[in-house]
Amino acid sequence: MIFEKQVVNGYKGMMHTRYDNVSLSFYFSHKDFDGFQREAYAFKSSMGHTLQGYLYYYDQFREDRLIVFDHGLGNGHRAYMKEIEKLCSHGYRVFAYDHTGCMESGGESTNGMAQSLCDLNDCLATIKADKRFAGLDISVVGHSWGAFSTLNISALHPEISRIVAMSGFVSVEEMVKMFFAGPLKGYRKAVLALERSANPKFSKFHAVESLKNSNVKALLIYSENDQLCRRKHYDILKEGLDDKENIHFLLVENKGHNPNYTEEAVKLLEVFKKARAKFAKKKNTTKEQRAQFLASFNWHKMTEQDEAVWQEIFAHLDDK
C-alpha cells in the first residue's frame, strides 16, 4: 500500500500538477509573424477558473469559420504557435486557450487526463453563447491531450462540423493501461480511481463511442512510432470506425508524437529534450544562462511543419 501511494503520487506529479513557464522552452508569439494579430478572450470554466484564450487572425480572414485549437499537456497554446499561424495564414481565424492549470490560466493543477474535454466543453459553450460568433461554422483541431478532447467533443456538441485530431488517446482508461503495463499493471485500479474522482463526468468518454454515432467530418492523424500515444490508439479507432465514411485516417512514419512536424524537426526536438534534461540538472542557473541555452537551438527548424501533412489537413478543413 505504501508503494502504491508513491506510484499514485508520482503520477499526480505528472498529470495533476500546475504547468508554468520555467524558462526551459522557447515559445513563439504572434509578434514573430508579420501582420499576425491576436485579441484576448478569457472565459470562466465550470470549475470556476478563468481560462485565458486569444483569437488569432490575419486581415481578411474567413468570417464564416472559426477553428478552436486544443493544446497538449503542459506547455499551453503558445507551444503550438506554428500550427496556429499555419491555420491563420490559410485564411482561418483561430481561438486558442490555455487549459486549466496551464500557463496563463487559473487552476491549482491540470486535474488529470479528462480535464481537456471538460475545458473544451466549457470553451464551446461560451463561444456558442456569444452573439459575435452566432452562426459560425466551428471546427476543432487538437494534439495529444487536446486531441483526446477533440476526438470526443462531437458527443457533447454535435453541431461541430470538422475535427482534426493528432496523436490523441482514445480514452483515459486506455491511456492508464499503457502507462501502467507489465509490473505496474497492479496500480491501474488506483490510478483510474483517481482520474474518475477528479473528473467523474468526462473520464469515461471513449472516442470510438463518441464518433460512432456522429456525423462530424473527422481526420485522425497518428505516427506509427509514437511512444507516448502509441499505435494501438490508431488501431482501436481504425477497427471501430473504419466503416464510417465521414472519418478519415492518416498514419505517418518516423514522426514520434508530432506527426505534423518534418522528420528533421522531430530529430532535432529529441536532441533538444536530451540536452534540456542534462541542463536542468545544473543547480542555480541564471536567467541569462537559461536564455543562452535556448538560443543555442534553431527553433524554426525544430518546429518545422510537414507540408504534405498540412495539405491533408487543409483539404479536410476546406471540404464543403
For the regions a protein language model found, what residue spans apply to each?
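C-terminal catalytic histidine-bearing segment of alpha/beta-hydrolase fold enzymes
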Residues: 245-320
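An N-terminal hydrophobic leader/cap segment in hydrolases
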Residues: 1-44, 51-54, 276-290
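Short beta-strand/loop motif that positions the catalytic acidic residue
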Residues: 214, 220-222, 226
